[in-house]
Amino acid sequence: MLYCVCGAETAPALERSMKMAVLKGLKPEKVFAYFEKLCSVPHGSGNTKIISDLCVSFAEELGLKYRQEPCNNVVIWKPASPGCESAEPIILQGHIDMVCAKTDDCTKDMTREGLDLMTDGEWIWADKTSLGGDNCIAVAMILAILSDDTLVHPPIEAVFTVDEEVGMDGAFALDCSDLKGKKLLNLDSELEGVFTVSCAGGMRSDCLLPAALTDAAGMEGFGITVAGLRGGHSGADIHLGRGSGNRLMGLVLATALEKFPGLRLAAFSGGQFDNVICSRCDAAVALPKGSGRAFEAFIREFEGVLKNEYAVTDPDVTLTCAAAETAKAVSAERTVTLVQALTAMPHGVEAMDTDFPGLVQTSLNMGVVKLDGDGLHIAFSIRSSIASRKLMLAQRVRAVAALAGGTVAERGVYPGWQYKRESQFRDTLLAAYKDLTGKDGVVEATHGGLECGLLMEKIPGLDAVSMGPELHDVHSVRERLSVPSTERTYELVCELLRRSC
């Protein structure tokens, strides 16, 4: 195992190079300095080498021991402050990848460019893209702690994982053999004052329904778009009843097939990530000649249905169509099968938790649907706090796929995180929160997936709590981070470290 420790330097280049054109003056200054620097480089899931190297450079220039894994995970060790050498180590953890979402008119290449941050002093957001506060604000807070020699703290093991957003690949790959801490503070939660102590397990299901694109000459082509949906995180927002572009497009096509026999599917593209509720879907169909006007009228009528049904959850939903070239399309017979399968597939909340009122127990998100030369690809994110329910939902997907002549590949199966009734670590954190704010912290479980479950499997006896500053509408272009909440959260983390000595 390769470790590196380089000569210390009082001001790391990562910190010196920060321009701070946007976030300068926001407190805590060092946290937002690191956050702005991290946001200046691309770091979408699967594209984490640059941001991983930034973390390595930081450790090198502070003279801290570190390890960088082939997958780009980074572990950094900081010795205890004077007088705390005998205290148990604490693991501080966050992930360095983000969900890259952008508006339809955004020209930014998020695989090559950083984000354009904006702030009004109370909130931070990114212009026309997601912010990636989930979870770079955690990384920024941890880097600030590692760089601050005035803090009182036990030995710190900082763990930065990759590709959490696409199946927790970094947590799966993480080598924990040299981690000594038995207390984990995960900073990947999004409600201040809420302390997560349990989470759902999950898995991904990738479905392929084979289909061939053949000549569609002599037919009328139309493009169809469902847009204006709010989208959101499939763990945090699935219970809100927001429309899924993929699901709604399936309903549009199913209804159209009843009115326009012979309709053929020519294109389908909805969603980018299986764990994000699809906010826009584009499709194209080939119709028998002479059907155009009737089809346009049908689309206008169906838009009214959607606007009525989703007036509260998605008030800006639109359904439009326009003439389009459709040189090739799936056969009419196979189109029927594909659309039937699409509408039969489960989506949304399946069951609510009986122990935590208001918490989703089991759900499935039809996150991505694409038609290509191989057929119709459907990617699902399945979540449940009960392992058997998770597997039963996966069985339903396999059953529908099999009836349509398709196949399913399953991946990214991760365990849930079971609630610990007694936890001194949790009690210390809650006491610190009460002393700092005068409020009682809220202890809850989440339907979202967290890396804590995987790390607890890898490190026997590990105790964990997840918390974080106020983040709204993560994974979407409306994502925003509260500045005052970040300051309070950082103060709480520092106080927890002090009390852990």
What are the language-model segments listed below?
Residues S17-W123:
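Acidic/His- and Gly-rich active-site-bordering loop/insert found
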Residues P28-V31, T354, Q361-D374, K439-E495:
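Zn-dependent metallopeptidase/amidohydrolase metal-coordination segment
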Residues E36-S40, A284, T318-A329, G367-V369, ...:
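A short beta-alpha structural unit
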Residues C84-K182, L208, A332-V336, P346-H347, ...:
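Active-site metal-coordination/substrate-binding segment of hydrolases
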Residues H153-G245, L253, L257-E258:
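Fold-level recognition of mixed alpha/beta catalytic cores in primary-metabolism enzymes, strongest
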Residues S177, R242-K259, L287-G292, V336-T343, ...:
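His/Asp/Glu-rich mid-to-C-terminal helical/loop segments that flank catalytic regions of hydrolases
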Residues T214-M219, I238-S269, P288-S363:
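Acidic-enriched catalytic cores of C-N bond-cleaving enzymes acting on peptides and small amides
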Residues S244, L251-A267, Y419-L462:
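Active-site-adjacent substrate-binding region
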